[in-house]
């Protein structure tokens, strides 16, 4: 079976300091599905006692360090008492380390297909967040736009509630998300700048203003080339902001315009 695994952008990103005895950061954001950037995934049940996962680009097999797909398959078997193993072939088009949620999208697409195939409808988002990742519930939800809170486990559907004309600028930089968060954690002083209730109200009125990404300055410190490109991209009529921990940018223009992907070679 073949399925598509879509990217997403994070419009605004408020990150909270870790609470005592917590290993994850709470956060707030607006996630938007990007349906013209996607990976193709082929899923086949196999008669083996081990999963067989491979990644490809347009021409060759590639090595991907993340074991999130393996962890997801193990979580499915443990949680739902499914014994099957699978061959997973993933053709990557979503850039790795781009702040577009590619790994989480892959995990969610595979989980969604297997659970539907097995007739399972119940998914505990909090368990998914705790065991696998904060972005996965959004990709499972079927929402095209959502306000995300409570470590990624609570989603408010915003699909169709505002029209946003934007460009996604893809840089050829693989950002290490873990290091960006470590840089964020090193700073003991942090002020939350986003008011998402106000942001959502403004977006419904076609107003894009005062939207911030708390990780942006830390990404720029670690990757000066990304900051340099950000300064280049700032221009009249566009609101430019980093997606996630980077390296992609969202450029928002309020005039009617089809979504556009700009690639940096």
Curated annotation (Swiss-Prot):
Q: E.C. number, please?
A: 2.7.1.148
What's a single GO BP term from this record? terpenoid biosynthetic process
Q: Kinase: is it a keyword of this entry?
A: yes
Question: What does it catalyze?
Answer: 4-CDP-2-C-methyl-D-erythritol + ATP = 4-CDP-2-C-methyl-D-erythritol 2-phosphate + ADP + H(+)
Q: Which UniProt keywords apply?
A: ATP-binding, Isoprene biosynthesis, Kinase, Nucleotide-binding, Transferase
Question: Which top EC class applies here?
Answer: transferase
Any one GO molecular-function label of the UniProt entry: ATP binding
Q: Which Pfam families match?
A: GHMP_kinases_N
Q: In which pathway does it act?
A: Isoprenoid biosynthesis; isopentenyl diphosphate biosynthesis via DXP pathway; isopentenyl diphosphate from 1-deoxy-D-xylulose 5-phosphate: step 3/6
Q: Where does ATP bind?
A: 95-105
Annotated catalytic residues: 8, 135
Quote the Gene3D superfamilies the UniProt record gives.
3.30.230.10, GHMP kinase, C-terminal domain
Q: Function, please?
A: Catalyzes the phosphorylation of the position 2 hydroxy group of 4-diphosphocytidyl-2C-methyl-D-erythritol.
List the NCBIfam families.
PRK05905.1 (NF004568)
Would you identify the family this protein belongs to, as annotated? Answer: Belongs to the GHMP kinase family. IspE subfamily.
Q: What is this protein called?
A: 4-diphosphocytidyl-2-C-methyl-D-erythritol kinase
């Amino acid at each position: 079976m073949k399925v598509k695994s879509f990217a997403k952008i994070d419009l605004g990103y408020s990150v909270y300091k870790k609470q005592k005895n917590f290993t994850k950061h709470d956060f707030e954001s607006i996630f938007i599905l990007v349906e013209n950037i996607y990976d193709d995934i082929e899923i086949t049940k196999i008669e083996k006692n081990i999963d067989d996962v491979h990644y490809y680009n347009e021409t060759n097999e590639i090595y991907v360090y993340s074991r999130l797909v393996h962890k997801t398959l193990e979580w499915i078997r443990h949680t739902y008492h499914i014994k099957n193993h699978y061959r997973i072939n993933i053709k990557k088009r979503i850039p790795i380390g781009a702040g577009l949620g590619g790994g989480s999208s892959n995990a969610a697409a595979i989980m969604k297909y297997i659970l539907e195939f097995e007739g399972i409808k119940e998914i505990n988002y909090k368990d998914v967040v705790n065991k696998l990742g904060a972005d996965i519930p959004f990709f499972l939800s079927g929402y095209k736009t959502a306000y995300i809170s409570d470590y990624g486990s609570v989603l408010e559907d915003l699909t169709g509630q505002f029209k946003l004309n934007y460009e996604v600028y893809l840089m050829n930089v693989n950002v290490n998300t873990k290091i960006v968060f470590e840089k964020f954690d090193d700073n003991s002083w942090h002020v939350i700048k986003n008011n998402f209730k106000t942001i959502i109200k403004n977006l419904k009125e076609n107003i894009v203003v005062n939207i911030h990404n708390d990780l942006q300055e830390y990404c720029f410190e670690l990757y000066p080339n990304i900051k340099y490109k950000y300064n280049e991209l700032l221009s009249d009529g566009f609101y430019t902001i980093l997606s996630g921990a980077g390296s992609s940018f969202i450029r928002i223009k309020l005039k009617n315009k089809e979504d556009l992907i700009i690639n940096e070679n």
